A protein has these predicted regions:
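N-terminal DNA-binding module of tyrosine recombinases/phage integrases
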Residues: 1-9
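Non-catalytic DNA-binding core/recognition domains of DNA-processing enzymes
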Residues: 12-84
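Charged, alpha-helical interface segments at or near domain boundaries
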Residues: 57-58, 62-134
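Structural detector for short beta-strands of small beta-barrel domains
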Residues: 121-124, 131-161
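Short nucleic-acid-contacting surface segments enriched for D/E, G, S/T with interspersed K/R
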Residues: 145-149, 179-196
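OB-fold (S1/OB) nucleic-acid-binding surfaces
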Residues: 155-176
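Extended accessory and catalytic-adjacent subdomains in large enzymes
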Residues: 163, 172, 179-186, 202-214
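OB-fold/S1-family single-stranded nucleic acid-binding modules
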Residues: 198-228
Length: 228
């Protein structure tokens, strides 16, 4: 019987220390929930991509403190280890991948500010109560809005620097939504988001909540009904 992917992560973890140990430990926790029974010979790029491009942007609040580089360095070390010891081919991540993860983290932070997300940190949980009050007041105005949409969307166009054109997955509906210029400057065509939208009495659309934001390179996983 082949070794399990998670047992190989634990095997590799014994060789790590310091920051790399912390990063690989996070990768083990992630993998034990999603790839618990997967054998090492079934490992592929998506195991790494889901961790780097779907899990990390939800957890890392400061993309400029070097943490993302540490995660990518640790994952590259692990990828090299399984290439050399188990003949499993997983691509090495590059500076482009680092910049893309940072971009997504930056977009998440901009949306938190734009939508009055009161959560400053998830671990430990820290909430800004002034922002919480603003968010609560905003949501009490829902009675004045005529229509809502929620689900996965792909970003199709950036319009005039303050609107984006979204296409709802599975239905194909196009919606033009107002955004902050700081957000418009960071997003790219092809990005994927899971969001709640509402239409105001003047028939323009706006964001209510952003639940998830992903780079286009995980679109195939979203289409396969992978949720994180």
């Amino acid at each position: 019987m082949e070794k399990l992917f998670c047992s190989v992560i634990k095997e590799f973890e014994k060789k790590m220390s310091g920051d790399e140990l912390h990063c690989i430990d996070d990768f083990f926790d992630f993998s034990s929930k999603r790839f618990r029974f997967m054998e090492i010979n079934s490992a592929n790029n998506q195991c790494i991509d889901k961790f780097l491009f779907m899990w990390i942007p939800k957890k890392v609040t400061n993309s400029e403190d070097g943490q993302i580089e540490k995660y990518v360095k640790s994952i590259n070390s692990f990828s090299k280890y399984i290439r050399e010891n188990y003949d499993v081919i997983i691509d090495e991540k590059t500076n482009y991948d680092i910049s893309e993860i940072k971009r997504i983290c930056g977009i998440n932070n901009e949306f938190k500010r734009f939508l009055y997300n009161p959560v400053i940190s998830y671990s430990p949980m820290i909430i800004d109560f002034d922002i919480y009050k603003k968010k609560r007041n905003m949501l009490t105005k829902d009675m004045f809005f005529t229509m809502t949409e929620e689900g996965y969307f792909t970003l199709e166009e950036i319009f005039r620097g303050d609107f984006v054109i979204l296409k709802k997955m599975y239905t194909g509906r196009f919606i033009k939504v107002a955004v902050d210029k700081n957000i418009a400057n960071k997003v790219k065509k092809g990005d994927v988001l899971f969001a709640s939208l509402r239409q105001n009495p003047f028939f323009s659309w706006e964001f209510v909540e952003l639940y998830k934001y992903y780079s286009s390179n995980v679109l195939e996983y979203i289409k396969a009904n992978v949720t994180f």
